Amino acid sequence: MSKKNLFNDFSAVSTKEWKQKIQVDLKGADYNDTLVWESPEGIKVKPFYNTEDIASFVTNVATPEWKIGQAIFVQNEVASNKKAVDALKRGAEDLVFTIPTDTIKIDVLLKNINLKDIKVYFYFQFLASEYIAKIEELYKDNATNIHYNIDIVGNLASSGNWFHNLTKDHQELDKIATITNTQNTIGVNVSTYQNAGATMVQQLAYAMAHANEYLNHFKDTTIPNFTFTVSVSGNYFFEIAKLRALRLLWKSLQTEYNTTANCTILAVPSKRNKTLYDYNVNMLRTTTECMAASIGGADTICNLAYDAIYHKDNEFGERIARNQLLILKKESYLDVVTNPADGAYYIESITHQLAEKALELFKSIEATGGFLSNLKSHQIQKKIKESAAKEQELFNSEKEVLVGTNKYINKEDKIKEDLELYPFVKTNARKTLIIPIIEKRLAETVEQNRLKDE
C-alpha cells in the first residue's frame, strides 16, 4: 500500500488570497489598523506569514547544543570552588566567574573542575596581562575551554573610563592576545545596551560596531575568538530572531575580515523587566527568556534567580534558576532538536529584518568614525536614552505591561523588610572620560513610590 501525501489534496494559498479572506472576516475594519502592529524596532508585524515572506533568503545558521551555566561572584576562592563543584553535581555544565581582584587564586578556584569537559567564562573587574599569563600557564592543555571576555571597550561604555588609559589598555589587550594565542580572548558585553533600554536593532548594531573596534585593532594579525554576552528580554519571538540575527551579522564580519574567528553567545535574562513586587512572576519571565535563548541559538545560558535584584546570592534562588534550565533541557528536550526555529516564516522574516536594519545602523556608525568615536561624542548614549524613554512611557501608560507592577497589582504585597540589596540605580560622583551607559529597570520609579507607602 503506497503512502499518500495529504498535502497534495490542498492547493497553495497565496498572500493575496489570505488577505482577501481576512478582509471579509473583518467586516469593513481596516486590515492595517486592526491587525498590523509596529515594534519599537520599526518592524511591521503582520497577522500571518508564508513562503512569500522568506522567498529571497534562508537563515542557514546552525544552532549549537546549549549548556547550562552557573554564575558565581568570587569573593573567596575556596567558598566559590565549593559552590561551583556543587553546582556541577546539580546540573550545571558551564561556569561563569566574576573575578573582582587579582588576589583571587585561580588554581584554588578551579580545583577538581575538569576543564576538558567544562567551559569556564571569566569576567575580570580589572585588566592585568600578568594575571592571564598565570592562568594560561596553569591550564595551557585545556585553554580552548576558557573564555577570558577581555572587553576594554565595554568597560569604557559602562563605567565611563578605561581600566588604565587608552594606550595602556590596548597594550594590555595585545599582550593578552599573545599570551592566549588568540583563543577565546575577546568579550563583547551587549547586555549593557539592552539593560539600559536600547532597541534590538540598536543592540545588534552596537554589538557589531563594538566588535569591529577589536577587529580593526587585530586586522593585521590573527583575530581572536569572540564571546558575546547577550541579555534576553520578554518579546519571545523577537528575542529568538535577535540571536539568530547576531550570528548572521557575525558571518558578515567574518567575510569582511576574511577570518574564521568564532562567535560564542552567552545568554542571560534581562534585568530591565524584573520586578520587586510579585517577584515570583520573575520566574515566568526568565523561563520564557531562557527558552528564547535556547531556540535562538545561544551556546551557554546562565539564568537569573527570581530574587537576584533584591536578595544576596542564595542556594534556593540559584537552585530554582538552574532547575528552570534543567526542565527546558531534560523534560522539554530543547537540546535535542537541531535548529528548532528553521522554517518558521515569522521568525525567519523578523530575523532578516532585524539583521538588515542593524546592518544599516552599523554602517552609519562606521561612517561617523566608529563605535569609540560615537561613544566619545555621546551619540550612542543619546540614542539609547531616547529609546529607553520611549519604552518607559509605554510602561508608564500600561501599554507595556509588567504583571504585578503596573497592572494586576496585589496591593497587599510588601517587600521592604526583604531587601538585602539596593535594587535601584546607584550613581557615584566621580570624574569620567565619557558619560557611562547606565542600566535601569523599567519598574524602579513605581517601586520606589510603593516602598515609601509601605
Predicted regions and their residues:
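A glycine-rich phosphate-binding loop feature that marks nucleotide/adenosyl-phosphate handling sites
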Residues: 36-41, 151-153, 190-193, 225-233, ...
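Short glycine/threonine-rich loop-to-helix capping motif typified by GTGT followed
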Residues: 199-203, 235-245, 272-284, 312-321, ...
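Glycine-rich anion/phosphate-binding loop at the beta-strand->alpha-helix junction
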Residues: 208-211, 229-321
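Catalytic-core signal marking the mid-to-C-terminal active-site face
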Residues: 319, 323, 329-454
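Conserved, mostly hydrophobic/aromatic
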Residues: 42, 91, 250, 296, ...
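Catalytic alpha/beta active-site cores
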Residues: 1-231, 235, 304, 435-453
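Mobile "lid/hinge" segments at catalytic clefts and subdomain interfaces of large enzymes
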Residues: 184-212, 295-299, 304-338, 342, ...
